[in-house]
Structure formats: C-alpha cells, structure tokens
Regions:
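Substrate-recognition "cap/lid" segment bordering the active-site pocket of phosphatases
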Residues: 34, 40-61, 113-144
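Mg2+-dependent phosphoryl-transfer enzymes with acidic/Ser/Thr/Gly-rich catalytic loops
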Residues: 124, 129-219
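Short, conserved charged micro-motifs
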Residues: 55, 91-96
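Active-site phosphate-binding/coordination module
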Residues: 1-78
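Charged, glycine-interspersed solvent-exposed loop segments at helix/strand-loop junctions
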Residues: 73-90, 111-122
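Short amphipathic alpha-helices in soluble, non-transmembrane regions
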Residues: 59-63, 95-105
Length: 219
C-alpha cells in the first residue's frame, strides 16, 4: 500500500516510535508516536516534544508512589508522557482518573487523554489530530485526501481533522464516534486495505500504459 501510494502511508499511535518500528519491521514508515508527541517524517527527520527532566522525574515519582495503592493497575512511562492502565483492575478507573487530574493541576503544561481502559498524561497540545495536520503539510502527503482508521477514543481528534480536510475517517468496531465510516473489526480492515492496494496498483499500471502509448504515438 505504501508503494502504491508513493510512500504516503503513516502509522499514528499512542505507542512509542520504537514500538511502532518493531511492529512494522522490516518496513520503515513515517510515524507519529505517543499521540503525536514524537513524529518522524518521510525523510527520517524526527520531531519530538520534550518534557524537562525534572518535571518528568517528579511526575514519575508521584505516579509510582500512588499507583502502588491500586493492585492490578499499571504505569507505563513513555519519557514525555505517562499511561495509567486499568484493564486488569477496572474498579480503579475513578481513582486513576482523579490521580491523573491532580497531576495536570500541578503541572498545567500536561493534559489528559482517555483511551480504552487507560488514561494518559501527555504534553498539552499533542494529539493524533495534530500529527495528521503536520503530515498533511509535508511531502508525500501534501495535496492528497487523508484516510485515517482508528479504534480508540484517542483517535477521535484524528477523525475530526480528517473530516475537516474532506478526507475519509473510519472507526473500527463499536462505540460513538465522529468518524464518517465504520468497519466491524480487524478482518474487515485487512480486506478493505487489500482492495484499496489492488485499486491503486491497477491505477499505476494503467498510467504507465497510457504514458507508453502517448510516447509511442509521438515517435
């Protein structure tokens, strides 16, 4: 799909870029990790939102101290962001939300981002929507119609941006959304992407054929 679209394919996730590269190996795509707090463009240049070491350390200490009171909850430190997971301890959702809100009150440069069984604390102004906006201002994405697929609450900011740009926003699975389209699950996503890839490849082949015929007529 990346080849058929001349490289205009990016992975945008709450995961770190290191994790995304490991998942996509051996391929190397433009990426936006940690909800846009870190991004790599088509040329390999990285764009990172840095959190001062002292602030990152103080937040980490507070979170580690408090989360120990909630068995089953997990803290994931991402450098400039922190994720409080409660999939294995849903009874602690309210307590962890309160904890995250307290952190953002102490450090107003941080913001909350809710997801599926997780609440994240990230630098204010970062989102998947902002990452899409940045990509759409750069080659090879500029001038194209964006298509964005996602299955989480954190993807809603991306859907909003894509809708505003006149693109195609696709929600995977159930749940309220501002996406314009919906696919039931991962198997449907694979089928849809394969269909798009085939269509793009055929278009490229047709263009080559047209170019060859035009050249032949000119000699």
């Amino acid at each position: 799909l990346a080849t058929a679209s001349d490289g205009a394919l990016a992975l945008i996730s709450g995961r770190s870029m290191v994790e995304l590269d490991a998942l996509a190996k051996p391929y190397r795509f433009p990426l936006a990790g940690v909800h846009g707090a870190e991004r790599r463009d088509i040329n390999g240049k990285t764009h990172i939102v840095h959190l001062p070491d002292a602030i990152a350390r103080d937040i980490s200490v507070q979170l580690h101290t408090v989360i120990a009171q909630y068995p089953g909850a997990e803290l994931e430190a991402k450098g400039m962001a922190f994720a409080l997971h409660y999939r294995q301890a849903p009874q602690h959702e309210d307590a962890l939300m309160t904890l995250a809100q307290r952190i953002t009150q102490i450090w107003p440069q941080m913001a909350l981002q809710q997801g599926k069984c997780v609440v994240e604390i990230k630098p204010k102004g970062t989102s998947k929507g902002e990452a899409i906006t940045a990509f759409m201002q750069e080659a090879p994405f500029i001038g194209r119609t964006p298509v964005f697929l996602g299955d989480d609450l954190t993807d809603e900011s991306g859907f909003a941006v894509v809708n505003r740009l006149g693109g195609m926003s696709v929600k995977i699975g159930t749940g309220a959304t501002q996406a314009s389209w919906r696919l039931a699950g991962v198997p449907d996503v694979w089928s849809w992407l394969e269909m798009i890839t085939t269509a793009l490849q055929q278009k490229r082949e047709n263009n080559r054929s047209d170019d060859y015929e035009s050249f032949s007529r000119s000699i």
